[in-house]
C-alpha cells in the first residue's frame, strides 16, 4: 500500500498503481502534459507500477530531461519510419545531440535528399495514428532472441558488448517497431510532433574505420512548434555564417578531399592566422613565456613512457623508419618535458614557462570532420609551466587573467567555466588527484570565477579548467584549457633541484588559450559573418577610381597606406564605380576609398565603411589616424 507525496499532499493507495494513475488522482489535468516522472529521485516511465512509498516529481516536455525523453522517443519513430520504407534496413545506434538526435543505419540503398523527405513524410503519417508507446522488461536472453528473430545484427552486438547477460533491460514498442533504450519514453507518440530531418552523413560502426560505413541521419526535435521554427530560423542564419562558405568566398582556405582534415591556407586566410599568432606572441611576452619549436615526429618510446600510448593510442598517427617506430605528435607536452630536462634546473629557475605554436595531428574519425572546426592537423597555442607546489595558485591565476584578456579582444563576454575532475581511465594516486582538483578549485574561487563541476571529464593525467565561449547565436565553443599535471614529470623523470639540494618533480600546468588556431579562426569567421574587425581583416582598405583620370591618385593613396603597413588593395579596372563598390562590399572590406575628380583636385578622400555610411576626410593622414586607433584598440 504505497503512500505517495506530491506538492505537500499525501495519498495512500490500497494497491500497486501506475504513475500515470497516481498523477490523475492528484490532478487529472496534470496527466495530460506529463511525459515521465521521478519517484524518490529515480526517473521512470509513467506506465511504471509503484508498490512502495515515495515522493513524486513530474517531468514535463519543456524540462531539460523532458526534451531528452522526447528526442529518444522520436529517434524510435525515425527507426519505425525507415523500417516501414525499407524493411531490410538494420538499425545500429542512436544518440541525443544538443538540438535533437542522430541514428546510424545500415541500408544497401544510399539515401538521397528526396529519401529524407520521404522518411519525414512517413514519420508524420505514423504520428496521425496517435499510438501509445509500450515498454516491456525482459531478460538479456529474451532480448537477444527477439533481435535475432528480427535480424537486427547491430542490436545483438550491443547486447553482447555492452550489457551483462545477467541483467534485465527495457524494450520499447512503437506498434510493430521494437528497440532498446535506457531512458524512459513518452507515453504517447503525440509528444514527438515537432521535428525536422536535417542531413545525412557517413559514420563507421563504433567510430572505427575498420568497420562498415553506416548512414547517419540527423534530426532536430523539440517540445513545441515555436522552438522548432526558431531553431530552423537560426539554422538558416548559421548557413549564412558557415565558415566553409565564407572561406571560399573570401579565398581563405580549402581542404583537399583526398587529404581530409588537413587545411590548405590561402594568402588571405594565412594573413588572419599570422595576425592571431602575432597577437598571442605579444601576450606571451607580457606574461614571460619562452617560445620553442618541437618536431612533429617523435620516437614511439617517449609516448609509451608518457602514458599516451595506453590512454590515447586510437587518436594517434603512427609511422616507422629503419625498423624504428614513431608517433606523429597529437600534443606538445612530452616534447616540452624533454626541453625542460635537457639540463639540470634549480628551484630558482621556476616557474619555467615555455610555449609553442605546435603542429599536432589527431586521428579523428572521418565522419566527425567539419571544416576548420574539427580537423586532423591543427596548430595548438600550447604552453607548459613547470613550477613548485606553492606556485600553482599564482600561475593558474596568471593563466586565467591571460585567457580573459585574449577573449575580450574578440568581443566574447559570455564565458562558461567548468572544472573537470578525475576520469575513470587515469594515472596517479587519489591523493595526487585530491590535491590537484583542490588547487584548481581554489584558483577559480580566488579569481571570483563562477564555475560548474564536470565530473569524470578530466584528462587522464590531471584535472582541468575548461573555458567555453558563447557566441552571438548562443552556441558553445570550448577553447581554453588549464590542466594541472602532477604525474607526467615523474613518468618522464623530469626534476629540478630544490632548496634542500634534492631532486624533485615539478608540477606541470598545461595551458591553451585559443586551443586550435584553425578552429578559433572558424569560430570568429562565423561570429563576425566574415566581416572581421579591422585589426583582423586580411584586407583592411580597398581603393577604387571613378575614371582613368584618377589612376595616379589611387596609386599614390595605395603607396601611402602600404608604407603605413595597412593591408590595402586597389581596383583600377575600367568598370562602373557601382560595380566596383559592390564587389568590394561582397568581399567584406571594412573601408572603401572612392577617388573621383573632386577628391583628386582637393587631395581628399571619400570613404564608405562596412555599414554603408559615407565619410569625408580632408587628408590621407586624418583617415589613417582614425583607422590606426581602431586597429590599436582592437575594436570589434
UniProtKB/Swiss-Prot annotation:
Residues the record lists as binding Zn(2+): 333, 384, 510
Q: Which InterPro entries match?
A: aa-tRNA-synt_IIb (IPR002314), aa-tRNA-synth_II (IPR006195), aa-tRNA-synth_II/BPL/LPL (IPR045864), Anticodon-bd (IPR004154), Anticodon-bd_dom_sf (IPR036621), Beta-grasp_dom_sf (IPR012675), TGS (IPR004095), TGS-like (IPR012676)
Instruction: Name the Gene Ontology biological process terms.
Output: threonyl-tRNA aminoacylation
Q: Where in the cell is it found?
A: Cytoplasm
Q: What is its EC number?
A: 6.1.1.3
* Region annotated Catalytic, chain positions: 242-533
Give any Pfam family that matches.
Answer: HGTP_anticodon
| Any one Gene Ontology molecular-function term assigned to this protein's record | ATP binding
A single Gene Ontology CC term = cytosol
Task: Enumerate the cofactors the protein uses.
Answer: Zn(2+)
What's in the keyword line of the UniProt record?
Answer: Aminoacyl-tRNA synthetase, ATP-binding, Cytoplasm, Ligase, Metal-binding, Nucleotide-binding, Protein biosynthesis, RNA-binding, tRNA-binding, Zinc
Question: According to its UniProt record, which reaction does this protein catalyse?
Answer: tRNA(Thr) + L-threonine + ATP = L-threonyl-tRNA(Thr) + AMP + diphosphate + H(+)
- Domain named TGS is located at 1-60
Report which superkingdom the organism of origin falls in: Bacteria
Note the PROSITE patterns from the entry. Answer: AA_TRNA_LIGASE_II, TGS
The note on cofactor binding and number reads: Binds 1 zinc ion per subunit.
PANTHER family assigned to the protein according to its UniProt record, in alphabetical order = THREONINE--TRNA LIGASE, CHLOROPLASTIC_MITOCHONDRIAL 2, THREONINE-TRNA LIGASE
The job of this chain, per UniProt, is described as: Catalyzes the attachment of threonine to tRNA(Thr) in a two-step reaction: L-threonine is first activated by ATP to form Thr-AMP and then transferred to the acceptor end of tRNA(Thr). Also edits incorrectly charged L-seryl-tRNA(Thr).
Q: Report the family membership.
A: Belongs to the class-II aminoacyl-tRNA synthetase family.
How does this chain assemble? Homodimer.
Q: What is this protein called?
A: Threonine--tRNA ligase
Give the species this sequence originates from.
Wigglesworthia glossinidia brevipalpis
